[in-house]
């Protein structure tokens, strides 16, 4: 039974790794700030999954320690990039949040140094042989691991907090995209915490089940980031789209960022406007010499 579980787990985690890479590429191809940040985040998520496969297959103590470090290092960088993404995604302008990005990068470097040292001198984790159904060793926490744990879950709390706070500040129709991302990160953190504090107690706690959730999280986060708003706007504009089918149509969201445009609008303004997903109403009006009040009133221009 243990062998069957191990085989199934390995197959599942390999599929999850492929999904992470595919979604990372798709996000990066969006060719904007959010896309690049998500692409890097998902790329590190794939590295986490790959290193965990190596952990499962490794039989030697030193090899297990090396691959465990290779697992913990990208985990921290993934959360650092996720926090940077969350600041951009929630359009947070608070200075403290942006300083937090720099602090997170410094902590990521310190975390990397700790786990580069750990295989030769155990300062963060040591390992106990168990000959389990899936892995051969489980970890025991040493003092320096506290830094890793506290700062990682600090980043988790920051990401969830930014998303929930943003959800309280936007119209009701837009709240699910922020709540969805925040809840997804929170669930993964809880599952990972089970693994951290109860390794080996039960079969599912012997392995980090949260790794399997990363691929689901990448899909959910990608969809909420790039597709949710357009889906909501399309539903709300289904009737007016038919009424104005012969007109160039451009729609901006409540923050003044472009959400929808049709091909006729692109043709009308292709010489004066460079359309991108980050185009704002103010930038559009400056490029076209259209009065911004016309857009705010909802009247055709």
Residue ranges and their predicted role:
Residues 228-260, 265:
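Sensory modules in modular signal-transduction proteins
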Residues 116-130:
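Membrane-helix interface motif
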Residues 276-301:
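Terminal output helix/cap of sensory domains in signal transduction proteins
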Residues 2-18, 32-118, 145-153, 204-215:
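Individual alpha-helical transmembrane segments in multi-pass integral membrane proteins
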């Amino acid at each position: 039974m243990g062998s069957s579980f191990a085989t199934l787990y390995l197959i599942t985690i390999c599929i999850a790794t492929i999904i992470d890479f595919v979604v990372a590429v798709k996000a990066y191809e969006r060719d904007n700030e959010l896309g690049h940040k998500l692409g890097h985040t998902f790329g590190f998520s794939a590295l986490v999954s790959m290193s965990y496969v190596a952990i499962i297959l490794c039989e030697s103590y030193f090899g297990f320690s090396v691959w465990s470090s290779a697992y913990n290092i990208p985990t921290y960088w993934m959360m650092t990039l996720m926090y940077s993404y969350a600041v951009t995604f929630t359009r947070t302008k608070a200075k403290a949040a942006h300083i937090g990005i720099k602090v997170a990068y410094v902590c990521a470097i310190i975390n990397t140094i700790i786990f580069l040292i750990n295989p030769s001198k155990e300062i963060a984790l040591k390992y106990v042989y168990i000959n389990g159904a899936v892995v051969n060793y489980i970890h025991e926490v040493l003092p320096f691991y506290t830094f890793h744990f506290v700062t990682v879950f600090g980043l988790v709390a920051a990401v969830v907090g930014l998303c929930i706070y943003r959800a309280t500040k936007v119209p009701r129709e837009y709240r699910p995209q922020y709540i969805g991302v925040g809840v997804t990160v929170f669930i993964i953190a809880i599952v990972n915490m089970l693994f951290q504090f109860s390794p080996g107690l039960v079969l599912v706690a012997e392995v980090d089940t949260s790794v399997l959730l990363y691929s689901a999280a990448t899909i959910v986060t990608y969809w909420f980031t790039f597709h949710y708003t357009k889906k909501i706007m399309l539903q709300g504009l289904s009737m007016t789209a038919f009424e104005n089918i012969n007109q160039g149509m451009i729609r901006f969201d409540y923050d003044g960022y472009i959400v929808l445009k049709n091909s006729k609008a692109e043709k009308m303004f292709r010489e004066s406007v460079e359309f991108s997903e980050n185009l704002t109403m103010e930038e559009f009006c400056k490029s076209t010499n259209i009065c911004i009040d016309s857009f705010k009133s909802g009247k055709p221009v």
